[in-house]
Amino acid sequence: MHFINEFINRGYFYQSTDLTRLTQISNSSQIVAYIGFDCTAQSLHVGNLMQIMILRLLQQCGHKSIVVIGGATTKIGDPSEKDKLRRIITNDEIQQNISGIKRSLKKFIKFDETKNDVLLLNNQEWLDSINYINFLRDYGRAFSVNKMLTMNSVKSRLERHTPLSFLEFNYMLLQAYDFYYLNKYYNCNLQIGGSDQWGNITMGVDLVKKLSNNEVFGLTTPLITNSSGEKMGKTADGAVWLNEDMCSPYNYFQYWRNIEDNDVIRFAKLYGEFSEVELSKLTELFFNNVNEAKKQIAYKITLLCHGRDEANKALNTAIQMFEHKKADENLPTFTIKDCNNLKVGIPITELLVTIGLAKTKSEGKRLIQGNGIRINNIKVNNINLVVQLHDFIDQVITVSLGKKCHILVKIAK
């Protein structure tokens, strides 16, 4: 399996520096590629999933890859695709986020230092110790401010007259230096990132060529949206996280189960690692029974993230909920310990906050008014509804937010 050919066939390709030469090198020798993740949250999400699948593909094709966690660059903040200055994230938050991101990555990837396992690095290791004066003297001459001002991440902010701090302006220098450092000490010759990173990546390519004259490449992926134009991993309820403490395996399964018909085959190629034979069968199934095809995709993608046991539980729970119309014990569960409250009753908005489906009672009201809440699969229309003991069947009710998020609410025995 040739890396670039498979990369293009799956739909990962957007733009590249010297694609012909990169293809030749990747077909004839082992490349060393790096992908970076900044530490802005305690988990990666579905929007990061393509980059993770690319890391797996590199490994499967016999290439070496490096994951760089941006412990240092997160302190600065990437201005790409941003309309305003990022909130400064504290060092403690960054360390917590690094821990969570490592958990996300280890679900999919084996980290080691053997021939084609993935190496995990943190750019704090080399950026935190940089002397600013020395950095300007040694590397500042290699960067053109004229070119930096033409970068989309900078240009768009200036055109909209939105603030761009000198702090953020430095981000692209540090990312370029990351590539130079990785090339010098790890023989890294390829950086892969999203299409919004093209300017930062090409600056890194130029820096390496100017300072060492080594042959390096940049490769970017497209921004993936669904058929409605929404970014992958974004829902009305927030991001779809990869870590199970932030998004249960069942809700993760449901996200994929509820994709639009037009996205089924495309997402199978992007995220499912289906073989050609499997994809052919899936395509045939899609035209005969689209819902069954969606279940197969949801199962496969959940299996890759959460393992076979959790994927089986999620599939069985979905079948019980939507085909047999029964609540399933494998749903995320909240237990009410004091049933005396239920004798008087709990306002629905208070219950939504208590079980974590709404952050505030006001948000709970908005969800109800938007027809987003169901109890035991019956739509809640009354924002003043009081949930009482008689609403529970065998001491259980199912509270649902939209089609994808379900909580089993139990009364403690």
UniProtKB/Swiss-Prot annotation:
Motif ('HIGH' region): 39-48
Keywords, in A-Z order: Aminoacyl-tRNA synthetase, ATP-binding, Cytoplasm, Ligase, Nucleotide-binding, Protein biosynthesis, RNA-binding
Stored SUPFAM superfamilies: Alpha-L RNA-binding motif, Nucleotidylyl transferase
Gene Ontology MF terms: ATP binding; RNA binding; tyrosine-tRNA ligase activity
Binding site for L-tyrosine: 34, 171, 175
Record's subcellular location: Cytoplasm
Entry keyword annotation includes Membrane: no
Pfam assignment, any one: SYY_C-terminal
A biological process from GO: tyrosyl-tRNA aminoacylation
PROSITE patterns hit by this protein: S4
General function of this protein: Catalyzes the attachment of tyrosine to tRNA(Tyr) in a two-step reaction: tyrosine is first activated by ATP to form Tyr-AMP and then transferred to the acceptor end of tRNA(Tyr).
Subunit-level organization: Homodimer.
PANTHER family registered for this protein in UniProt: TYROSINE--TRNA LIGASE, MITOCHONDRIAL (PTHR11766:SF0), TYROSYL-TRNA SYNTHETASE (PTHR11766)
Protein name stated in the entry: Tyrosine--tRNA ligase
The species this protein was found in: Orientia tsutsugamushi (strain Ikeda)
Lineage: Bacteria, Pseudomonadati, Pseudomonadota, Alphaproteobacteria, Rickettsiales
